[in-house]
Design a protein with these regions (language model features):
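Alpha-helical scaffolding within the catalytic cores
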Residues: 174-175, 250-263, 289-297, 327-337
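Substrate-gating cap/lid alpha-helix
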Residues: 30, 314-352
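Beta-strand-rich ligand-recognition modules
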Residues: 151, 158-211
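Loop/turn elements at helix/coil->beta-strand transitions in domains of secreted/extracellular proteins
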Residues: 23-28, 188, 267-271, 304-310, ...
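Extracellular beta-rich ligand/substrate-recognition surface
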Residues: 117-129, 165-172, 249-250
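An acidic-aromatic loop/edge-strand motif
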Residues: 1, 30-118, 188-258, 264-267
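Surface beta-strand/loop "capping" patches
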Residues: 121-125, 129, 135, 141-146, ...
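Aromatic-lined ligand-binding clefts that engage carbohydrates, nucleic acids, or primary amines
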Residues: 106, 134-162, 191-193
Length: 386
């Protein structure tokens, strides 16, 4: 429904929609996905038998005592508590996000310069605060408004005129915040961003939209917008050491298979759309074997030896100057192609041309979904002719 579709897979939605529009046959889709997951987490213990390294890792984490001890040792909660306690912006008499806060002694900066993110020698983790005043007309103040803040590394909380309007806890999602009706007023308004840096790369991602959109967000149709690039006020809130890492136990071998595939085996499944790989690029030399093992494993579990798999090619990513990184991604795409070439009923869906150099999760899932739909419809028509 329109109310619950947003957290769902955009690729799966557009694929199913396109198939339905062309066939008038409803398509049932199951979304079983976890961002950032490695392929070995999606393979059963039986399927991992050819990979003793991963089987051994799996058995290590079978110990409840080990898992509990690791959870107790990990300090991420303590790090966040220390950050909140030490953040001056939250504890002054007038908090830094307040509409009437006096930021006249703050530093002028540009969001995309690196000067604010460093102490001269190293990047600074912790909290960084930004404020910007902007003018709104009486007409704009009465319209629906959406705040676009590109992508931010790592996390953020955002306020408009002292009112909290949204937060994202990690770097990848586009920042799209609704400004509640009545919050903007004719004349001067203020946006405050509290940016959190965990791992030494605080930044606002370049070449993304930083603006306020009014109405339906269609400036090409005459609706207004306010550009938020340019000068901002800046102040460091709380410098911190790098945040301690956390162990993603569900990423361990067999973890996601047991939790998210095994419970689905009683469903009748016609095929699989497989969009994964970024987390395996550093181990690309083994990916062909691992993905082939996963395909065979799932086919055995569903007792369908020819169950179709549609592998989504990894999208283009990284700056043109990052030769090493781009080479690694190209080699990974080659491994994906080899899986499709050497396994029956496995199709590679082109996606590299839909990538964005500055976004590991490119936004155009509609075109990609239509490509998957086209591949499946071709296969259906071929079978029908037989």
């Amino acid at each position: 429904t329109p109310e619950n579709v947003m957290p769902f897979s955009a690729l799966a939605y557009f694929f199913a929609k396109d198939v339905y529009q062309k066939t008038k046959v409803p398509v049932g889709i199951i979304n079983s996905s976890v961002g950032g997951s490695p392929v070995e987490a999606w393979i059963s213990e039986e399927g991992l038998k050819p990979f003793p390294y991963y089987l051994n890792e799996k058995r290590i984490y079978e110990s409840d005592d080990l898992v509990e001890s690791m959870k107790k040792e990990e300090r991420s909660h303590a790090w966040n508590v220390a950050l909140c306690q030490g953040d001056k912006g939250m504890h002054e008499a007038t908090p830094w996000y307040a509409a009437d806060y006096d930021d006249s002694n703050w530093t002028e900066t540009d969001l995309f310069t690196s000067g604010w993110a460093t102490n001269g020698l190293n990047t600074v983790n912790g909290s960084h605060w930004f404020r910007k005043d902007f003018q709104v007309s009486a007409q704009q103040a009465g319209e629906k408004a959406t705040l676009r803040l590109g992508c931010i590394v790592d996390a953020d909380s955002v306020y408009v005129n002292g009112t909290f309007v949204g937060t994202v806890s990690y770097q990848y999602p586009p920042r799209i915040y609704t400004i509640p009706a009545g919050l903007l007023k004719a004349g001067k308004n203020t946006i405050t961003i509290r940016l959190f840096s965990y791992g030494g790369r605080p930044q606002f991602v370049k070449e993304k939209p930083y603006k306020i959109l009014f109405g339906k967000g269609q400036p090409e149709k005459g609706e207004s917008e306010i550009n938020l690039e340019g000068s901002w006020k800046y102040h460091l809130g709380a410098p911190m050491p790098a945040a301690p890492g956390q162990t993603a136990f569900h990423y361990k071998p067999t973890g996601l298979y047991n939790a998210m595939i095994a419970p689905l085996l009683n469903y009748t499944v016609s095929g699989v759309i497989w969009y994964q790989g970024e987390s395996n690029v550093s181990r690309r030399n083994e990916y062909k074997d691992l993905l082939t093992a996963m395909i065979s494993d799932w086919r055995q579990r569903w007792n369908k030896s020819d169950m179709p798999f549609y592998i989504i090619e990894l999208a283009d990513f990284l700056s043109p100057t990052d030769k090493g990184g781009r080479t690694a991604w190209a080699e990974f795409r080659k491994a994906q192609a080899e899986v499709a070439d050497t396994n029956k009923n496995v199709t590679l869906i082109k996606n590299s041309d839909l990538g964005e150099w500055n976004d590991i999760h490119p936004l155009d899932k509609k075109t990609l979904g239509q490509r998957v739909a086209a591949a499946i419809l071709i296969e259906m028509n071929t079978k029908n002719r037989k």
